[in-house]
């Protein structure tokens, strides 16, 4: 893997990319003197600006003072050169004067790619360079610069005035003209522009404010030196990594704070997000957000250049994580106005003086006047631009929440004593702003979640398809235009890609945090969604729900929304009383996350290499001291210190130290690991450095990891397809894909049955017309269920979570005329005339279902007869042509309910519902005499009941309590690899729902699903720990779950945040076991890997306490007992000291392979199972040399796992039951060493077992079934 030669290492840049001084040229100033003498200052008020000086890092070179041990490969990559002749005789690499490029004194200066020096003067003086007769106040404004690749850099410009006096010597210290009285009354503007890769608007404004105090006092020939010194300081300040650590630097006289981004997915927010709320009413804010969401051509106007960029950036920040991807030029100078004629979407800004000119000349623009708080459209475009309204309920909630904000710091600070310290007062204001920013981000994110929450219901993740047509059907009529425009944007397309890629960004986190219990339950359902009775009732009760789907009444304009007792402008003065609307939008109580400050050491002489190295040394020392003071629970903060220290070691040329610091990020926060920088660092190392790194175990693994991951072929950025009906004939595989894309059903096995039904009696392919008819039938049934109008009295008879799935036509029954309705639980009659409710039967109580006929005059009318257990009278309904279908459907639901009750598995009812609805659609599609016979192919449970009725054994039924399906919603079941139960606890750091007990379920490829064990609903739907098989899980302390993987990594999951941001990479082969002491709060965890390595870890610090290597490989698991580590290998069980000395060996009596073992200290027993045999062996711990006692497991073909529960051993495997192979559990009585119970657990092998507080045992099945069973412990 060694590189043939060290490569150039481009070091990460600091805050500064470029610093420039701009103003009028020397020739212009000479002319100004002459004009001013003749005509006065007013006649010479306008000059042409240009770049006078450019300062680009690095400001010190290796030649100035080489650091011992620094790699010769270190250096800055050159991006673009700018050549100018200089008037000074001495060459300086950090500075350039634009001018004549001819002559021998020209040089190269590296200019950042996103900075166009030709356009920079116009942007730094967007109005003009105006000479003044008296000094003016300093003026700061902000720029966003974009290169041809779309990469943005950010500029902060400070304009200041200097007198044009008699010894003007700005360039080289020489006087150029004679003193004059008039020139002394001239004040000429100059600008200093700082360009950074990071949008530190407030921070860089503070820095420039400090610089201006020096520039005003210095002499002309000293200006460049001051700016150069200032630029060098900024270039040495690193950008803080994402997270809670902010950096603070003493710029004198101000302490300047550089905030970090909240997380790697979030932008840096260093501006006052409430500025738009001071300038626009909330309704206008929504309108502007809509313009951005629909990607209009937008132009901001203001008489204050500074507000243009700040306002545009605020609105873009409001829409995070959605991103504006088009042209973004917040400031246009007068010479750039033709930019607004661009035909594509853009967001630009102009001075208010140009408002009328732009309005008249350009068509189709949205014009936003910041000064007057108005939003209008340019000429002759009112008919062309249709700015739709945000959905009404979301708009009302947003407005109420915005009006509840306190937008004035004076109100917050009124009760505080006056600050006598400048920086203390600034810190107070900053804390207030941080809290307000957090609330505003929360409000806008809630708006986005409300707008797009249900998009996920119409996504197919397997084939990356979005069914926009069906999504639009679920939107209210008045919201159609809004969604149609939004769905057609690049912004929304990128949002869809992020959802399909499973990105856990701010949107996904809030969606998860705010989902209702019903949403959590819905995620576990495999049957199609329908509105519940409770939702139907609330739809009727609430007048706000008049906007529900398929309404024909249009929405009112957003501007017309009236909210009682909420005056629009008062919101910025005080907290509003929102008691009237509290039920729908309570006042937010958002607490920003805790942040920490780290003070950067002073940089005394930033242009001297030795002083710069001393600064790096001081910085490293301060970081190391801060790290030493941290407690074991401060891993997030520790990670930031490691990151910064790693960067500083790179600057010092200490590559090995840098890599060791970056390697520590695996144990503290892998989320900020700079993989690309580490890879480039390794590539830049000399042969000797690389060899030294390879000799360090931690770095050897780090290098392998980074190069392996980067060696993988980059995944294609798969586009999102919009669902379309097929246009060609489909074979089985294509049909499966199309049905999954449509969102009708995902389970491939069910789709295979559907294929057989639709092709019954025909060639085994489906034509486009049949598919279209089937899809239409399905969607029409879905729409009918959405529009069912149920009488109010019905709510008293049905459960709140029941849904009406099917309604018959109006029929005559022996209990009245009406429509038969089917829910997942029962059949009932909706009587006509006077609306009423007559219960027919619950599926549990059905005793018999018959399809017969009754005579009427000369006709035989098909009739459905249903007999129930509790009632003597048989229900009869003259269903006529619908009779055969209802007969099939009722029998399938009855069979599904019986299976659900027998197996304690509600998923059977959900699957029966899916089968029933598919039957209905098949009959509606085929409309032929054979349609019913074709539909019967889908009556899976009824057919199974007829062909091979299997009674659940009594012992199994009595012990089994419940079953859950972690693979619900997947295309096929997945094997359960490992289960872990963690008890609930009420921790101040946890939300109430987080305090519930949890069940952690590891599926294939590193997927982990977390269930709330108090309700068995999904708590966290599938996150990843690597991409390999999970072998073991254990709980450490109360907030960590450790996961051992086949890829040799231990992943650590934070229980509070449900994130996996730590990894232990010390093992070199698959991690096979994790063990903790049985104490309440284990301080140590032992891990083992297949190669025989055993490592003891400190849980708090994640440091290795001890490690040893067994001479035997194939280490399968470990257990702790009596200060010894018991190790199970394939061939032996070993008793080992914590130091790694083997004290005892236990061999298999038949030279077979061990599979697992369990220790029972109270009974002084050791139980072991073997691979491929159906016997258990029990040794006495008193004398392991004695031959073991053997127990034979009847009808067992394989043992796969075993656990100890109280005074029992539960053994999982597979064996015969009623002539078929099933997953089985044997419960062993440890005293009698006999089988106490034999449980028929699953359709597939029992793969794993775990105990829940010794009250329940949970078993996980193989891939054929993929379910979890919950068993009561006697």
Swiss-Prot record:
State the InterPro entries in the record. Answer: cDENN_dom, dDENN_dom, DENN_C, DENN_Domain_GEFs, Tripartite_DENN, WD40/YVTN_repeat-like_dom_sf, WD40_repeat_CS, WD40_repeat_dom_sf
Locate the region Linker.
520-970
**Looking at the record, which segments are called Disordered?**
65-108
Q: Which GO terms describe its biological process?
A: endosome to lysosome transport; protein catabolic process
- Pinpoint the dDENN domain residues: 402-506
UniProt-reported outcome of changing residue 554 to A:
Abolishes interaction with 14-3-3 proteins
Which residues are recorded with the post-translational modification Phosphotyrosine? 940
Q: What is this protein called?
A: DENN domain-containing protein 3
Phosphoserine: residues carrying this PTM = 554, 572
Q: Is Nucleus one of the keywords UniProt gives this record? A: no
What spans are recorded as compositionally biased (Basic residues)? Answer: 76-88
Assembly description: Forms oligomers. Interacts with 6 of the 7 known isoforms of 14-3-3 proteins.
GO CC, sorted alphabetically, is:
cytoplasm
Top-level taxonomic group = Eukaryota
Q: What residues does the uDENN domain cover?
A: 75-245
Which keywords label this protein?
A: Cytoplasm, Guanine-nucleotide releasing factor, Phosphoprotein, Repeat, WD repeat
As recorded in Swiss-Prot or TrEMBL, the protein's gene is named: Dennd3
Give the matching Pfam families: DENN (PF02141)
Give the cDENN domain ranges: 268-400
């Amino acid at each position: 893997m060694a590189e043939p030669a060290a490569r150039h290492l481009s070091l990460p840049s600091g805050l500064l990319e470029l610093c420039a001084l701009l103003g009028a040229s020397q020739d212009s100033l000479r002319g100004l003197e002459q004009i001013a003498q003749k005509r006065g200052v007013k006649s010479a008020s306008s000059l042409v600006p240009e770049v006078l000086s450019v300062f680009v890092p690095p400001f010190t070179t290796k030649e100035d003072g080489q650091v011992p041990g620094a790699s010769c490969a270190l250096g800055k990559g050159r991006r673009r050169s700018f050549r100018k002749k200089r008037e000074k005789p001495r060459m300086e690499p950090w500075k350039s004067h634009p001018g004549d490029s001819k002559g021998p004194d020209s040089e190269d200066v590296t200019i950042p790619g996103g900075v166009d020096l030709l356009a920079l003067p116009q942007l730094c003086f967007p109005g003009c360079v105006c000479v003044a007769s008296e000094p003016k106040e300093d003026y700061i404004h902000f720029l966003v610069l974009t290169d041809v690749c779309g990469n943005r850099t950010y500029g902060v410009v400070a304009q200041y005035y200097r007198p044009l006096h008699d010894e003007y010597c700005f360039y080289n210290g020489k006087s150029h003209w004679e003193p004059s009285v008039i020139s002394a009354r001239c004040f000429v503007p100059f600008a200093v522009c700082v360009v950074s890769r990071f949008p530190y608007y407030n921070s860089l404004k503070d820095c420039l404010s400090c610089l201006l105090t020096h520039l005003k006092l210095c002499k002309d020939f000293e200006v460049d030196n001051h700016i150069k010194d200032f630029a060098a300081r900024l270039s040495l300040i690193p950008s803080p990594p994402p997270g809670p650590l902010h950096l603070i630097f003493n710029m004198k006289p101000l302490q300047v704070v550089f905030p970090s981004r909240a997380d790697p997915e979030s932008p840096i927010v260093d501006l006052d997000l409430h500025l738009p709320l001071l300038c626009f009413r909330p309704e206008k804010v929504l309108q502007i957000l809509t313009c951005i969401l629909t990607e209009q051509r937008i132009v901001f106007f203001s008489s204050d250049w500074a507000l243009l960029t700040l306002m545009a950036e605020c609105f873009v920040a409001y829409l995070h994580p959605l991103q504006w991807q088009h042209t973004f030029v917040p400031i246009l100078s007068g010479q750039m106005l033709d930019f607004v004629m661009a035909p594509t979407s853009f967001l630009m800004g102009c001075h208010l003086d140009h408002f009328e000119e732009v309005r008249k000349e350009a068509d189709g623009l949205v014009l936003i006047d910041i000064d007057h708080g108005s939003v209008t459209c340019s000429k002759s475009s009112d008919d062309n631009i249709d700015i739709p309204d945000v959905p009404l309920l979301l708009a009302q909630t947003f407005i109420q929440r915005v009006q509840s904000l306190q937008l004035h710091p004076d109100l917050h600070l009124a009760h505080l004593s006056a600050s006598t310290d400048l920086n203390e007062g600034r810190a107070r204001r900053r804390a207030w702003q941080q809290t307000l920013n957090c609330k505003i981000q929360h409000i806008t994110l809630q708006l986005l979640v409300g707008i797009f929450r249900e998009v996920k219901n119409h996504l197919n993740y397997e084939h990356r398809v979005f069914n926009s047509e069906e999504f639009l059907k679920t939107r209210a009529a008045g919201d159609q235009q809004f969604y149609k425009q939004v769905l057609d944007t690049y912004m929304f397309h990128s949002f869809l890609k992020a959802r399909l890629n499973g990105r856990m960004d701010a949107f996904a986190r809030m969606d998860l945090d705010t989902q209702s219990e019903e949403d959590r339950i819905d995620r576990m359902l495999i049957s199609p969604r329908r509105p519940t009775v409770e939702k139907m009732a609330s739809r009727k009760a609430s007048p706000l729900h008049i906007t529900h789907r398929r309404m024909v009444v249009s929405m009112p304009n957003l501007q017309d929304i009236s909210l009682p007792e909420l005056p629009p402008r008062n919101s910025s003065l005080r907290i509003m009383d929102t008691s009237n609307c509290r039920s729908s939008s309570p006042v937010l109580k958002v607490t920003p996350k805790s942040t920490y400050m780290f003070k950067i050491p002073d940089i005394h002489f930033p242009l001297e290499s030795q002083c710069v190295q001393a600064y790096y040394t001081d910085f490293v020392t301060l970081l190391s001291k801060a790290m030493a003071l941290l407690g074991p629970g401060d891993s997030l903060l520790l990670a930031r210190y490691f990151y910064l220290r790693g960067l500083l070691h790179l600057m010092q040329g200490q590559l090995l130290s840098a890599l060791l610091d970056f390697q520590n990020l695996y144990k503290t926060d892998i989320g900020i690991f700079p993989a690309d920088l580490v890879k480039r660092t390794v590539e830049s190392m000399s042969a000797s450095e690389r060899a030294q790194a390879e000799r360090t175990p931690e770095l050897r693994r780090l290098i392998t990891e980074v190069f392996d991951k980067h060696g993988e072929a980059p995944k294609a950025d798969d586009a999102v397809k919009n669902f379309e009906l097929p246009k060609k004939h489909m074979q089985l595989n294509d049909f499966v894909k199309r049905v999954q894309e449509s969102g009708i059903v995902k389970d491939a096995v069910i789709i295979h049955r559907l294929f057989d039904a639709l092709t019954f009696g025909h060639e085994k392919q489906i034509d486009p017309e049949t598919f279209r008819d089937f899809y239409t039938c399905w969607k029409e049934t879905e729409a009918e269920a959405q529009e069912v109008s149920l009488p109010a009295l019905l709510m008293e008879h049905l459960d709140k979570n029941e849904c009406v799935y099917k309604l018959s036509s109006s029929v005559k029954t022996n209990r009245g005329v009406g429509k038969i309705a089917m829910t997942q639980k029962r059949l009932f009659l909706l009587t006509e005339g006077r609306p009423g409710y007559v219960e027919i039967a619950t599926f549990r109580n059905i005793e018999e279902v018959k399809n017969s006929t009754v005579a009427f005059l000369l006709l035989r009318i098909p009739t459905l007869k249903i007999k129930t257990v509790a009632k003597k009278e048989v229900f009869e309904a003259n269903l006529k042509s619908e009779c055969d279908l209802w007969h099939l459907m009722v029998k399938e639901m009855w069979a599904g309910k019986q299976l659900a009750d027998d197996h304690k598995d509600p998923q059977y009812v959900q699957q029966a519902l899916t089968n029933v609805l598919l039957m209905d659609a098949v009959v509606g599609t085929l409309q032929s005499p054979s349609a019913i016979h074709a539909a019967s192919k889908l009556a899976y449970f009824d057919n199974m009941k007829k062909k091979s009725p299997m009674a659940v054994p009594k012992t199994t039924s009595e012990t089994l309590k419940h079953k859950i399906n972690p693979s619900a919603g997947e295309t096929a079941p997945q094997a359960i690899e490992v289960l872990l139960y963690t008890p609930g606890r009420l921790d101040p750091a946890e939300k109430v729902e987080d305090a519930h007990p949890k069940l952690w379920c590891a599926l294939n490829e590193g997927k982990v699903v977390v269930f709330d064990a108090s309700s068995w609903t999904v708590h966290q739907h599938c996150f990843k720990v690597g991409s390999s098989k999970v072998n073991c899980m254990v709980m450490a302390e109360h907030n960590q779950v450790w996961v051992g993987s086949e890829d040799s990594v231990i992943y650590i999951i934070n229980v509070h945040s449900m994130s996996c941001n730590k990894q232990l990479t010390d093992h070199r082969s698959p991690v096979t076991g994790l063990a903790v002491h049985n104490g309440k709060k284990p301080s140590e965890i032992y891990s083992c890997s297949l190669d025989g390595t055993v490592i003891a870890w400190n849980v708090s610090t994640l440091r290795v306490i001890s490690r040893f290597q067994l001479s035997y490989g194939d280490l399968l698991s470990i257990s702790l007992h009596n200060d010894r580590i018991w190790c199970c290998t394939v061939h032996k069980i070993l008793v080992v000291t914590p130091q790694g000395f083997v004290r005892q060996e236990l061999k298999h009596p038949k030279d077979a392979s061990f599979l697992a073992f369990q220790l029972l200290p109270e009974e002084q027993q050791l139980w072991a199972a073997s691979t491929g045999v159906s016997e258990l062996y029990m040794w006495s711990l008193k004398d392991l040399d004695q031959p073991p006692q053997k127990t034979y497991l009847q009808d067992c073909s394989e043992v796969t796992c075993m656990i100890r529960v109280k005074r029992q051993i539960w053994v999982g495997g597979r064996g015969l039951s009623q002539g078929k192979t099933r997953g089985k559990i044997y419960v062993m009585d440890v005293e009698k060493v006999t089988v106490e119970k034999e449980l028929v657990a699953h359709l597939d092998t029992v793969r794993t077992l775990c105990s829940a507080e010794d009250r329940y045992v949970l078993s996980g099945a193989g891939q054929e079934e993929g379910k979890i069973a919950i068993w009561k412990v006697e």
